[in-house]
Design a protein with these regions (language model features):
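Signal peptide-directed extracytoplasmic domains
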Residues: 1-134
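Bacterial extracytoplasmic/cell-wall-associated proteins, especially those involved in peptidoglycan
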Residues: 48, 82-287
Length: 287
């Protein structure tokens, strides 16, 4: 309603900052506060955390834009005592994140969005908990469905993080369907994105996964592990989380994307192989 009100009344020049707003304030009063800049803080910092990025990217962003050093940020992210405190505070965080095989316990749990903080002296814990609060707000809408699911929240976020890396938003539910169908018949997910993550690489670093990469022995590589990897491989968007919870109903087990980002889905390995050969012949897929 806020956005509609602003658009209808052609309100401009809202000042981005942190404000002390009261629940009793009317919408016009809130708008006036934002326009006038009452309590405006010129030291406010804006941090934009993008979906599909990793904990390491978020750590770098925090270190580059606050008065916390990279070492200080990394220390908080890895602090087991602090992680246990977070587990007691947030219903969707469990001991699963403390698995010793997981590279970064909070991978997949910090909701990607734009956040504002008072100044560069903001603490790492304040940033983390602000993002966890937003993840809680988003997941609360799905809590009943998650609780009635055969998957844990950790598994759902793990799947969502893979979906996020494997395609475009419009294909998320189809991709989710493929992975759910594979999981249901104990078929390996064979996601290149997981093999990249297990080796600390990105697709942009190496291109198409090599046989050596796909055979790499690590707890994230779904060419090796029989089901889901040990944990998330990126920070998933709400669209990816929604897709992981509510996949499209199909019988597809395979998909392939061409060089232009178009994704094709198939029920059989032969259909997949035929399309791959067709794309290669047309110069639309790189070996």
């Amino acid at each position: 309603y806020f956005k509609v009100y602003v658009k209808i009344h052609n309100i401009k020049n809202l000042k981005a900052s942190t404000y002390d707003l009261k629940k009793s304030m009317s919408l016009p009063s809130i708008i006036n506060t934002l326009v006038e800049g009452n309590n405006y803080n010129p030291n406010t910092i804006k941090l934009t955390f993008k979906e599909g990025k990793r904990v390491t990217d978020y750590i770098a962003l925090i270190a580059d834009n606050t008065n916390n050093t990279k070492e200080e940020v990394e220390k908080v992210f890895a602090d087991k005592k602090y992680l246990n405190e977070l587990i007691t505070k947030y219903w969707f965080l469990t001991d699963e994140i403390l698995n010793s095989e997981i590279y970064y316990p909070l991978e997949g749990y910090l909701f990607p969005d734009t956040y504002y903080f008072n100044d560069k002296d903001v603490t790492v814990s304040k940033i983390i908990e602000t993002m966890l609060d937003e993840m809680k707000n988003k997941l609360n809408d799905y809590k009943n469905k998650i609780n009635n699911s055969q998957m844990t929240t950790h598994e759902i976020l793990t799947l969502a993080s893979i979906i996020e890396k494997e395609g475009k938003t419009g294909d998320f539910k189809d991709i989710s369907s493929v992975f759910h169908n594979r999981l249901n018949i104990s078929m390996k997910l064979q996601s290149c994105a997981t093999s990249y993550y297990g080796l600390g690489l990105e697709f942009t670093d190496v291109g198409i996964a090599t046989a050596e990469m796909m055979n790499s022995q690590n707890p994230y590589n779904t060419y090796i592990v029989p089901a889901l990897p040990v944990g998330p491989i990126s920070m998933p968007s709400l669209n990816a989380i929604e897709a992981a919870i509510n996949p499209k109903n199909t019988n597809n087990l395979y998909f392939i994307s061409d060089n232009e980002g178009k994704t094709y889905f198939f029920e059989t390995a032969k259909e997949h192989a035929d399309k791959k050969n067709e794309l290669i012949a047309a110069g639309k897929w790189e070996r």
